[in-house]
Each structure stands twice: as C-alpha cells, then as structure tokens.
C-alpha cells in the first residue's frame, strides 16, 4: 500500500456517483493513493466500477466472508470479524483519510465518518453539498460549496454554515444521527 490510504464508503441506496465524488476520486488516483473499499452493493460497487474503468489498481476490497460479495478484480483482504461493522472499523483504523458519498440519512455511512480520526470529505448524493469533516480541529463539521458560483444555474446552492461542536459525533447527532 502507498503511504496514504483513503477509506471510501457510502450509502447502499445510492445508484450513481455524484460529479463531486468522481472529481475527488480523480484527485486521489492522480496522487497514487491506496483506496480501501468494501464489498457491498451501492457505493462500494459503484466505486469499484469507476476505478476499474479508469484502470486504477491501487485498490483493496475489504470483506469479512471467505470471499468478497463484490470484487471487480482488485486485491482483497479478509478482515477478522463476523459483522460488516468489523470491516468498517478495520478500514477506519487503517486509513489516513476518508471519502464518504452519503445520502444524508444512512446511519452506517455517518458512523464510518465518525470512526475516522482524521479528515473526511463527505459528498451528498444529491450533488448539492460537500461537507469537510475534521474531528481533530475545533470546527468539527463544516459545509463547503460544492461548486464555485454558478451564475447559469442559481438553483445550485453555495452554503457556508458550520456547527462549532468541536466533534463530528456531536455534529451528526445534531442532524439526528446517533453514533
């Protein structure tokens, strides 16, 4: 694995990767970072498809069963444990950074963001917001604009608000997600 490892996770309900997530993946690939991804349907498979189509090979599919449920030809590692949350916890401990593609409701993805003790970029699946979460800073949950001002489409929100909770867990709980 490269020195920098990215834990990519997301909601199972998501059917396509938002443009902002694709841009983040392109930057990750350009820097040659190792990507850890799970073996579930939804975002895990979408991520694998995108990386496979790009010919990117610095990918490890993590799983708890004897074989991954979904693997599009990448290296894989069986993680000790019997629950999918064991796999998520392993990836959270192993990664330096995280990328989450979140539907805004999935408690599993929210918990994955909270597990990471480092920076996480969370892209909202409706492609309207991008959230920078940094559990080690004083600002634990910051909304940053998804795009630069888009005069041709005033419906694209540019949102700068933050919860000064100091911890991602508290910020997620403000949104009704228990970690």
Predicted regions and their residues:
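Short metal-binding segments enriched for Cys and/or His
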Residues: 155-177
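Short, Lys/Arg-enriched, disordered terminal segments
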Residues: 1-3, 177-179
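Acidic/glycine-enriched connector segments
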Residues: 2-3, 14-127
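Short, hydrophobic/glycine-enriched beta-strand segments
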Residues: 4-12, 131
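Small side chains
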Residues: 98, 137-140, 166, 171
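Short recognition patches in nucleic-acid-associated and regulatory proteins
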Residues: 128-152
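Short glycine-aromatic motifs
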Residues: 74-76, 141-146, 171-172, 176
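A broad, low-specificity signal marking well-ordered, structured residues that form hydrophobic/aromatic
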Residues: 6, 59, 156-157
């Amino acid at each position: 694995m490269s020195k920098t490892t990215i834990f990519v996770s997301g909601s199972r309900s998501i059917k396509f990767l938002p443009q902002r997530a694709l841009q983040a993946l392109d930057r990750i690939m350009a820097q040659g970072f190792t990507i850890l991804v799970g073996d579930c349907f939804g975002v895990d498979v979408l991520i694998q498809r995108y990386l496979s189509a790009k010919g990117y090979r610095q990918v490890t599919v993590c799983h708890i069963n004897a074989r991954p449920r979904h693997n599009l030809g990448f290296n894989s590692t069986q993680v000790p444990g019997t629950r999918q949350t064991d796999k998520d916890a392993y990836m959270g401990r192993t990664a330096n950074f995280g990328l989450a593609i979140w539907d805004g409701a999935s408690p599993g993805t929210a918990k994955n963001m909270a597990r990471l003790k480092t920076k996480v970029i969370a892209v909202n699946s409706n492609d309207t917001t991008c959230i920078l979460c940094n559990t080690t800073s004083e600002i634990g949950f910051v909304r940053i604009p998804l795009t630069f001002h888009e005069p041709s489409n005033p419906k694209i929100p540019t949102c700068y608000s933050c919860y000064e909770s100091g911890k991602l867990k508290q910020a997620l709980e403000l949104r009704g997600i228990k970690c």
